[in-house]
Structures are given as C-alpha cells and as structure tokens.
From Swiss-Prot:
It comes from Ruegeria sp. (strain TM1040). The keyword DNA-binding does not apply. Residues 1-21 are annotated as: Disordered. Keywords: Plasmid. Belongs to the UPF0262 family. NCBIfam families: PRK02853.1 (NF002769). This is UPF0262 protein TM1040_3562.
Length: 159
C-alpha cells in the first residue's frame, strides 16, 4: 500500500504556535510518518506515480493545497480543497481543545475524560469531512485522515 514518507507544512506566514499546538503538531507528524495509508487513484486513465510520497500542505487563496511528489521529487499530484467545509468543525475542535487543555490543569479525571470524549468525537467528524473532500483525489484510512485533520487545524488557525 502506498504511503506518505515525508510531510511539510507551509506555515511561513503563520504566527508561532502555542506550546500545546506545537506538541499536537509534532505528535501528528510523527504518528503520520510512522503509519499511514495514502493512495493516489488512477485518474482519466492516466497512470499515477507510485509512492511513497512527500506531501506538502499549505493554504493558498483560502484553499487547502495538497502538493504530492514522489520521493525522487517528481510531481505526483496537486489538489486544492475549499476550506469552507472545514471551518465549523475546526472551530469546534479548537474550542474543545482549549477546554481540554484548561481541564487538564484544574479538573478531576472524570471531567477531563468527558471533555476528551467530546474532543475525540469532533476530531472524528473532521477526519470524516476530510475523507469526503479527498474522494477521487486520494484515498486515506481513518487514522491518516485524523492526523491530517490535526495538521489542517494548525494551518487553518495559524498556530
């Protein structure tokens, strides 16, 4: 199965992330590189270069850009996704993450667990939206979609 072997976020124009967001980002990238599934389907009867792939994620002109290259540096694909379908779920995810980070410092474990369950539910929704938006462009499994959604959140809210 094809996979992502390297990932880069184009965050040059973003403010520095908070320590919590930077940690989430590092974990998502590490986990993504360790295990993922990323397949470029055949399009218009044209063959697609085989992976592993290098993926660059960026936001350009209010669109999420997936720039996919082979390990040899050849262009494998590039696709642009509207950010509109992600706006509400990203906003909800950040709000629940703020609550979670605050709860970890002050609340008992039972309340932290409740907030964490809500956080996971919103994260799952974001990964589902991503899988839908990637349909016909790239095939990703649920864990890969979850990790990519985390990175989209970092880009979407600018750290």
């Amino acid at each position: 199965m094809s996979r992502i072997s390297q990932i880069e976020l184009d965050d040059r124009n973003l403010p520095p992330p908070t320590p919590e967001i930077e940690q989430e980002r590092k974990v998502a990238i590490f986990d993504l590189i360790e295990e993922n599934s990323f397949v470029l389907p055949k399009r218009d009867e044209r063959d697609v270069p085989e992976g592993p792939y290098h993926l660059s994620l960026s936001i350009r002109e209010k669109r999420l850009v997936f720039d996919v290259q082979t390990e040899g540096g050849d262009k494998a694909a590039e696709f642009h996704l509207s950010l509109s379908p992600f706006r509400q779920v990203v906003k909800d995810y950040y709000q629940i993450c703020e609550s979670y980070f605050t709860a970890v410092k002050t609340l008992p474990p039972s309340q932290i667990e409740t907030i964490d369950m809500a956080r996971r539910g919103i994260h799952n929704e974001g990964s589902r939206v991503l899988q839908e938006r990637l349909e016909g462009k790239a095939e990703v499994d649920t864990d890969t979609a979850r990790r990519l959604f985390t990175l989209i959140c970092v880009l979407h809210f600018g750290g």
